[in-house]
Design a protein with these regions (language model features):
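Short, well-formed alpha-helical segments that are part of the catalytic scaffolds
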Residues: 50, 72-85
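Cell-envelope/extracellular polymer assembly enzymes that use nucleotide-activated donors
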Residues: 61-64, 94, 232, 247
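Acidic donor-binding segment of Leloir-type glycosyltransferases
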Residues: 81-127
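A short, conserved beta-strand element in the Rossmann-like catalytic core
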Residues: 101-103, 155-158, 183-185, 225, ...
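Long helical/loop segments within the catalytic core of UDP-sugar-dependent glycosyltransferases
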Residues: 114-126, 130-147, 160-242, 253
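Catalytic donor-sugar/metal-binding loop of nucleotide-sugar-dependent glycosyltransferases
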Residues: 214, 240, 249-267
């Protein structure tokens, strides 16, 4: 009975959050909800549809895309293909891939990819450099200079208009961080991947509910856009924890820096199959 009660409560909460639709807290105070293609309201539709937003962002901010990669030979070429397709001013978008001591063909593939992508910078780290993923991200943070940092996993898959949606929401909404909703690309593989897909969907509903209640969402590592000055004020990425995304969420909150959720388009990643 307790399990059934909990399921009903959580299910009802998720349903009510979904039906409420629009996340008004993600919009600037003077904006008006616009409609997506399915007729529902969303903050990203409001911002993307407002010509004043595009005009005010005639000078788009510099963005650094940062990826920590260890033994990612299976996905690194696809990653760069997607990043190369992003619709954003080329002179204001830089990619940093930190080869974190890879022992497969990742280093060779990155060498082959560099001539194809002029904005690609590769940082090499020894496998025992320490700090884990956070250490790799901090290495890129120290060498880059963009106003905004987009953190992706090597298997992260984003759409070509991702930055066109992310940046207006972040800038016009006065957010210090924007987390993309996470989704799974291989959900139908087996029970384990389906469970992970369900977990990500439910987590997104919880984050949306927090925002609708006037709160903030949490950062989730893959697919997070961060303001550099706030990130640096927080001391960068914490190398002494394995839950660096949750740690950073708390440190942003302690700084008074607000974070929100981008519902569409999501960042997609591969679920663990075994």
């Amino acid at each position: 009975i307790p399990s059934l009660t909990l399921a009903l409560v959580l299910g009802g909460y998720s349903l009510s959050t979904t039906l409420r639709g629009s996340d008004a807290s993600a919009m600037p105070a003077n904006s008006t909800p616009a409609k997506d293609g399915d007729g529902t309201s969303s903050p990203e539709a409001s911002l993307a549809a407002d010509p004043a937003v595009i005009e005010s962002l005639a000078s788009w901010p510099n963005v650094d895309v940062v990826v920590a990669a260890r033994d990612e030979e299976a996905v690194v070429a696809r990653l760069m293909e997607r990043l190369g397709a992003l619709r954003y001013p080329a002179d204001q978008l830089t990619t940093w891939i930190v080869d974190d001591g890879s022992e497969d063909k990742t280093p060779d593939l990155l060498d082959e990819l560099k001539p194809q992508y002029p904005n690609l910078n590769v940082i090499r780290r020894q496998r025992n450099a320490g700090g884990g993923k956070s250490g790799a991200l901090n290495a890129a943070l120290a060498q880059s200079s963009g106003e905004w940092i987009l953190v992706l996993d090597a298997d992260g898959q984003i759409s070509d208009d991702q930055l066109e949606r992310l940046i207006p929401i972040a800038v016009m909404g006065d957010w210090s961080g924007v987390q993309m909703r996470k989704a799974v690309t291989n959900a139908d593989t087996n029970l384990l991947t389906r469970v992970q897909a369900m977990e990500m969907a439910f987590d997104a509903l919880i984050q949306q509910g927090r925002l609708l209640g006037g709160g903030v969402s949490e950062l989730r590592g893959n697919g997070q856009l961060l303001r550099r000055d706030v990130l640096e004020a927080c001391g960068g990425f914490n190398e002494d924890t394995v839950t660096d995304d949750l740690d950073l969420s708390f440190r942003f909150l302690l700084q008074g820096a607000r974070t929100t959720l981008l519902w569409n388009p999501p960042v997609r990643e591969e679920a663990v199959e075994t």
